[in-house]
Amino acid sequence: MSSHNARILDQFTRQAVPFSQSPSVSNQKALEFIVSSAGAGPDDTVLDVACGPGLLVCAFASVVRHATGIDLTPAMLQEARKAQHEQGLANVTWDHGDVTTLPYPDAHFSIVSCRFVFHHLQDPLVVLREMARVCKPGGRIVVADMAPAPDKVNALNAEEQLRDPSHVRAMPEEELRGLFTQAGLPEPTVGHYRVECELDDLLSRSFPNAGDEQQIRKMFSDSIPSNSMDLNTCAQG
């Protein structure tokens, strides 16, 4: 196993329960926005790549024929199975695996999605090409991730790498769009949605190195006057 995958396993094994319970992660309107943007319907078969606790898979499963989630972290898949059971969904499959080499045939799914993942990938183009490989001709590929402004991306990445050591690099929207071109895909349709999150909630599902929390809090506070991390951070109370 690569050292980066080891960091992923370490972080997301510990994050599995708090991540799945976070209001910002489980935001129903955000999940519905992705499902709607994908044009999902009763004839679709869906793959969600690096599915985490399965929230998006379950959202898709309520409207499609079948939904599959794959993830590297067994603890995340355990939370995903709990979510499936709680929602009474029978049309779901969970697979354990590395998303850089998806264990599915070519042209197998009509929708292939990926949420809050690309900033954790060392080579997102490899994963996008795999997503394209397993997607049927005429299917839809959906990538949802943070997309900071070009002049603010470095500040955001510095904070995120401190908060979550498995974070690699968030990309500006133009760079994300460029990945589709490099993967031989059509120009993507771009939509935006905003999810609000309390800093305490964010830190409760993060496991930074010992002693770094105060520095992270200061980075958020210092970013407020100029919105230097492009997170629209504000102070309350």
Where are these regions (language model features)?
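Conserved class I S-adenosyl-L-methionine
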Residues: M1-G41, L55-A59, M76-E79, E86-Q87, V142-H167, ...
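Class I SAM-dependent methyltransferase SAM/SAH-binding core
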Residues: L47-V49, P53-T101
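Conserved Class I S-adenosyl-L-methionine
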Residues: P53, P124, E187-G237
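A short acidic, Gly/Pro-enriched loop at the edge of an enzyme's catalytic core
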Residues: T100-I111
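A short SAM/SAH-binding and catalytic strip from SAM-dependent methyltransferases
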Residues: S110-Q122
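A short glycine-rich, Lys/Arg-flanked "PGG" loop and its adjoining helix->strand segment in the class I
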Residues: L125-P137
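Short alpha-helix
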Residues: R169-A183
